[in-house]
């Protein structure tokens, strides 16, 4: 009975531990506030996609020319909120649309969706076709920029010109997950242990520290409002599913070959002090395609659109107006598409 008694004690202790973790997870979920959806102006709308409702904001409907579609990156709490310092400003001259990727922000977060780079490439393509009018300019960041590159390569008729902020998938985040990734994904999707791991990773302290040390050069830009929004968004029901796929490697996107083939005019944007996607990597990527140019923002890490919004918005406005003029000139010449400089 001694060994049997010890086994039962261990089992009961383990069960109590799991129950305690479950209680903590439930408490965190209850305390999470609703994220703020008013950071971007315009009208809130829903796009009924095959895997769920996609939330987006739209403004500048009366402005002429092609629309700008904003595509955010991947991370806990990340959403179209990240474009709050750009959306309204550019809406003065352009029709602008910013949407939350499936699994993020206010979009649906189905647990059984096949979260992957392919899924997001398909979502972006469908959004441009069915919501943006069939052709658009794109502003995208990180892995979102990599997905945009694939869209522009696979469906060139959908994309006119792009601004790509530190696209991932060049020499990192470019491999498919193996058995270890699949096993890790299974662990992260477990109701108790996976949720507990996620809650630690997406705690207010973790979010604040990551933003201060990795995302922003000036830590003072990591405001309490920003941290509160990222935390609230990251703890909406189902928010862990897409992040589990990301951390397991399922959202990785090898975009080098696609980038080299692109015919659309594009600007690469990089923060001079960015350590995750340094300028040297952007220079190497630039060498793959002579149609691209590079703009480097000093005193900046990953978030030039937030650290230097005036400069970023001026760049975007000038660039897309230039490409719209080039496109209209090409149409008058009798060609449907034309690349600037040709």
PLM ranges: what are they?
Residues 262, 268-270:
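Short beta-strand/loop motif that positions the catalytic acidic residue
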Residues 58-106:
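Conserved HGGG/HGGXW glycine-rich cap/lid loop of the alpha/beta-hydrolase fold
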Residues 133-177:
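Conserved hydrolase catalytic core segment
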Residues 174-178, 199-260:
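Conserved alpha/beta-hydrolase catalytic His-Asp/Glu region
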Residues 272-277, 302:
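Acidic catalytic loop of the alpha/beta-hydrolase fold
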Residues 290-342:
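Catalytic active-site module of serine/aspartate enzymes centered on a nucleophile-bearing elbow/loop
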């Amino acid at each position: 009975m001694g060994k049997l008694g010890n086994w039962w004690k261990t089992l009961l202790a383990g069960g109590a531990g799991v129950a305690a973790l479950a209680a903590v997870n439930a408490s965190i979920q209850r305390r999470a506030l609703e994220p703020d959806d008013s950071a971007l102006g315009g009208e809130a709308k829903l796009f009924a996609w095959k895997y769920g409702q996609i939330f987006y904001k739209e403004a500048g409907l009366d402005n002429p020319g092609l629309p700008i579609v904003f595509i955010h990156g991947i991370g806990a709490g990340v959403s179209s909120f990240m474009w709050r310092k750009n959306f309204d400003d550019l809406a003065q001259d352009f029709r602008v649309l910013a949407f939350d990727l499936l699994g993020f922000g206010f979009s649906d977060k189905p647990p059984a969706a096949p979260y992957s780079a392919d899924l997001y490439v398909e979502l972006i393509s469908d959004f441009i076709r069915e919501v943006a009018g069939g052709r658009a300019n794109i502003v995208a960041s990180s892995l979102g920029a990599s997905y945009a590159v694939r869209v522009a390569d696979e469906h060139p008729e959908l994309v006119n010109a792009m601004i790509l902020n530190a696209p991932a998938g060049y020499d990192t985040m470019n491999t498919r997950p193996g058995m270890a990734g699949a096993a890790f994904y299974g662990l992260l999707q477990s109701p108790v242990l996976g949720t507990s791991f996620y809650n630690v990773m997406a705690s207010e302290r973790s979010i604040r520290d990551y933003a201060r040390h990795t995302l922003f050069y000036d830590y003072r830009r990591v405001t309490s409002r920003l941290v509160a929004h990222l935390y609230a968004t990251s703890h909406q029901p189902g928010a862990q599913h897409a992040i589990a796929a990301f951390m397991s490697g399922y959202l990785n996107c090898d975009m080098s070959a696609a980038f080299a083939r692109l015919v659309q005019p594009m600007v690469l944007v990089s923060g001079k002090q960015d350590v995750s996607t340094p300028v040297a990597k952007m220079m190497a990527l630039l060498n793959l395609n002579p149609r691209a140019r590079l703009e480097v923002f000093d005193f900046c890490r990953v978030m030039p659109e937030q650290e230097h919004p005036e400069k970023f918005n001026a760049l975007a406005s000038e660039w897309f107006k230039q490409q719209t003029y080039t496109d209209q000139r090409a149409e008058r010449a009798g060609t449907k598409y034309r690349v600037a400089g040709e």
